């Protein structure tokens, strides 16, 4: 199990009513987030290890929830921007062999790239502990992919803790949600 999932489960047990996510006025505590993720995992299709899944909702809460659902099902979340043109999204799905798209919590639809898993598995193996794939904004052409692995994410927690222990009253994460992860 990924460390990020273990930590989410831990906080759901130890601090269930603490805020896990807050986007504008929408607040989700650890207990309800973890429960929703577990429920969705039970009721969703099973992915092959490393299957890529596009997160394509305008709600950051929905995308984060699906992010964890995909990770718990051994998939690789791919953050796409729902403001991109259909043509751009289709090109990214084809180019990066994204097999599923999700636009609602726990609802996954196969793409035209479904079943092309074997063609890109060697690329997957080049990235140790791949956690997710994000994309640049695409202002200079087709958005470029960047890969985030789990060790780099875990390392970012030490820096986040420094901010929290300085008792900051507000923190800002400019840019797209995917870049903040």
Each PLM stretch: what is its role?
Residues 9, 17-47, 148-151:
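Conserved AMP-binding/adenylate-forming core of the ANL superfamily
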Residues 26, 42-83, 173-176:
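Conserved AMP-binding/adenylate-forming
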Residues 29-30, 131-158:
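Conserved AMP-binding A3 loop
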Residues 55, 163-181:
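Conserved AMP-binding loop of ANL adenylate-forming enzymes
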Residues 87-88:
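Short acidic active-site motifs
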Residues 107-130, 147, 155-157, 162-166:
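Flexible, low-complexity linker/hinge segments
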